[in-house]
UniProtKB/Swiss-Prot annotation:
Subcellular location: Cell membrane
Entry protein name: Monocarboxylate transporter 14
Membrane topology, as annotated: Multi-pass membrane protein
Cytoplasmic membrane side: 1-27, 495-510
Record field: transmembrane: 28-48, 74-94, 103-123, 127-147, 159-179, 191-209, 315-335, 353-373, 379-399, 408-428, 443-463, 474-494
Family per similarity comment: Belongs to the major facilitator superfamily. Monocarboxylate porter (TC 2.A.1.13) family.
Record's function text: Proton-linked monocarboxylate transporter. May catalyze the transport of monocarboxylates across the plasma membrane.
């Protein structure tokens, strides 16, 4: 599904040190790097796979709460949208805390969102617990997974990102089957409790994301509390713990009564030293945290808001408009296909092999095949990208016309294959803005995709509530998608016209 941040050049630091030229590390392109791929693969399964399977729960929520389809669709849309929208802002946590801590916290928040959602009394409760909480946790765990793969790989980065993101397709297939089974056997509330427990594995995946630099972080306050103190303070610490034994070694056995008197006299001094040390440690910790948060915020702010020149690039602005319309057309089938299956009485065939699973499996092959085709020297990446977009929008228009399982299966396969163009988005973005602005530009595109995922499914459900047909939902969303594609087509034409006019003006001056 989302390649999200494949090859986007994120360079967040797990430690607070300034970036330096790194020597070749034994784990680059090998060793522990493949554990990063495995960790990222399971993150994609647990996060993206479960989000693409939310159509199963959407049907259960409609039956439980008896709300409109438009309102109910907001639950899954919030979760999907927030996962993507918060991507650039999660960079602040990564700069401050590191990838490992961010991912572990994200796993806990995501699991908490699933568990609290099991006790929902209405749809509005789910907006907060599942849409916001689970979505935020997903975003916090997802971005570090992609960032760490990029940091551990240089020569094989494309292969590593491709392998890790295939977890989305596998996850969609597995999570759809799992949620259908859990809902049938235990009910949707217990299914969400179990899914919350499963989501705790995100913490395990996060624990595998160890920084490249071996050893402990020298800037950690717990490690430098003593070493970073003045010399006399360090001596005081040593003396308080070992003074009695030192005196015994240096001065012999001595008089026991004299030794007791000396220790009694020094107790107030030791207590004073301990208080001073405790206060000094607290001050050092607060100062260290303040500096680290400040540096992380400055890096994040300069990275995402210091590139206003990107918006002077009209092709990039057109690409943003495309992203605002495009992503919802991919998400809508996942959310509403289970309901369409029920409307057409195709549940028996769909139980054997769910339509959403067809999209997920073919999507894996689509990403690989389209990537290989786009790498051919005789083929333009833009042409492959546009052709895949046209195929996807055509499939969206045709889907409502299919009322049989076989017809829907063929269209779902086309949707899955053509949506593999998501693996080309980083390449297209780099062509537009250059490698130096790739990270920031791609973060903006992902935000636009998140807005599209947030608004698309509720809009389709709202249209169904008015017309009592899903046909118009797909037609209107497909039309909006076509408008986004037209933005991409118009801009090259404008560029050609401007170049021709410039050449004409230059010739006239000569």
């Amino acid at each position: 599904m989302y390649t999200s941040h494949e090859d986007i050049g994120y360079d967040f630091e797990d430690g607070p040190k300034d970036k330096k030229t790194l020597k070749p590390h034994p784990n680059i392109d090998g060793g522990w790097a493949w554990m990063m791929v495995l960790s990222s693969f399971f993150v994609h399964i647990l996060i993206m796979g479960s989000q693409m399977a939310l159509g199963v729960l959407n049907v259960e929520w409609l039956e439980e709460f008896h709300q409109s389809r438009g309102l109910t669709a907001w639950v899954s849309s919030l979760s999907m949208g927030i996962t993507l929208i918060v991507g650039p802002f999660i960079g602040l946590f990564i700069n401050t805390c590191g990838c490992r801590q961010t991912a572990i916290i994200g796993g806990l928040v995501n699991s908490l969102g699933w568990v609290l959602s099991a006790y929902a009394a209405n749809v509005h409760y789910l907006f907060i617990t599942f849409g916001v909480a689970a979505g935020l946790g997903s975003g916090m765990a997802y971005l570090p997974a992609v960032v760490m793969v990029g940091r551990y790989f240089q020569k094989r980065r494309a292969l590593a990102q491709g392998l890790s993101t295939t977890g989305t397709g596998f996850g969609t297939f597995l999570m759809t089957v799992l949620l259908k089974y859990l809902c049938a056997e235990y009910g949707w509330r217990n299914a969400m409790l179990i899914q919350g427990a499963v989501s705790l594995n995100l913490c395990v995946c996060g624990a595998l994301m160890r920084p490249l630099s071996p050893g402990k972080n020298p800037n950690d306050p717990g490690e430098k509390d003593v070493r970073g103190l003045p010399a006399h303070s360090t001596e005081s610490v040593k003396s308080t713990g070992q003074q009695g034994r030192t005196e015994e070694k240096d001065g012999g056995l001595g008089n026991e009564e004299t030794l007791c008197d000396l220790q009694a006299q020094e107790c107030p001094d030791q207590a004073g030293h301990r208080k001073n040390m405790c206060a000094l440690r607290i001050l050092k910790t607060v100062s260290w945290l303040t500096m680290r948060v400040r540096k992380g915020f400055e890096d994040w702010y300069s990275g995402y808001f210091g590139t206003a020149s990107l918006f002077t690039n009209r092709m990039f602005v057109a690409f943003i408009f495309w992203a605002l319309f495009a992503y919802s057309s991919f998400v809508i089938p996942f959310i509403h296909l289970p309901e369409i299956v029920n409307l057409y009485n195709l549940s028996e065939q769909n139980d054997v092999f769910p339509l959403t699973s067809i999209i997920a499996i073919v999507h894996i092959f689509g990403k690989v095949i389209l990537g290989v085709i786009a790498d051919l020297p005789c083929i333009s990446v833009w042409n492959v990208f546009l052709l895949a977009n046209f195929t996807l929008v055509l499939s969206i228009f045709i889907l409502p016309l299919m009322h049989t399982y076989a017809g829907l299966a063929v269209i779902c396969a086309l949707i899955g294959f053509s949506s593999g163009y998501f693996s080309l988005m980083p390449v297209v973005t780099e062509d537009l803005v250059g490698i130096e602005h790739l990270a920031n530009a791609y973060g903006i595109i992902i935000c636009a995709n998140g807005i599209s995922a947030l608004l698309g499914p509720p809009f389709a459900g709202w249209i169904y509530d008015i017309t009592q047909k899903y046909d118009f939902s797909f037609y209107i969303c497909g039309l909006l998608y076509m408008i986004g594609i037209l933005f991409l087509l118009i801009q090259p034409c404008i560029r050609i016209i401007e170049q021709s006019r410039r050449k004409y003006m230059d010739g006239a001056h000569v």
